[in-house]
Amino acid sequence: MSLYHLANALQTCFERRGTSNDLDEAITFHREALLFRPASHPDRLASLNNFAYALQTRFDQRGTSNDLDEAISLLREALFLRPIHYPLLSNLLKRLAIALRIRFDQGHLLHDITEAISLYEQLLDCPFDDPNRSWSLEHLPAALRERRALIGDHRDIVEGTVAEGQSLM
């Protein structure tokens, strides 16, 4: 069994049993497996996604900001490496947007909310029947309001109103 598959198996064990040691071991094996999957490896994207998911799960459990920071870094790399017509692009954009919003809620850093807004806007380019598109329409106005509260740009009010109107269609 490869390190990658072992990591995924331990992550599944954690999801079923809730034993934090399983999640810690899964993260250790994900980290090691990634070393054997350089940027040119065809399965690196899957490793990045699953590793980021494990770190986000541990962040949800313990609130350790380093886990969230690393998950964001991994998701950014996954977004960079993904093929042009990657079928799970909207899921990847959504996961990164969620992670950035969580980090913004903790530190109120302008670059986090701005990047999250950019990801929400990219999700608007998804097909109308993609559930992540409608999810983005629901969350974009609040993110724009939060950014406006930080920098006072009135254009965020207009964009937020337009997004809210689209979500009602």
Question: What does each model-found stretch correspond to?
Answer:
Residues 17-20, 32-45, 62, 77-90, ...:
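Flexible helix-coil transition and linker loops at the boundaries of alpha-helical arrays
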Residues 23, 30, 68, 75, ...:
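Hydrophobic/aromatic packing residues within the alpha-helices of TPR/SEL1-like helical repeat arrays
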Residues 1-15, 43-57, 88-105, 118, ...:
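Conserved alpha-helical positions within TPR/SEL1-like repeat arrays
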Residues 2, 9, 127, 143, ...:
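Intrinsically disordered, low-complexity linker/propeptide segments enriched in Ser/Thr/Gly/Pro
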Residues 11-24, 56-69, 101-114, 145-159:
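Short coil/turn connectors between adjacent alpha-helices in alpha-solenoid helical repeat scaffolds
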Residues 1-4, 20-25, 40, 49, ...:
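Long, intrinsically disordered low-complexity tandem-repeat regions enriched in serine/threonine/proline
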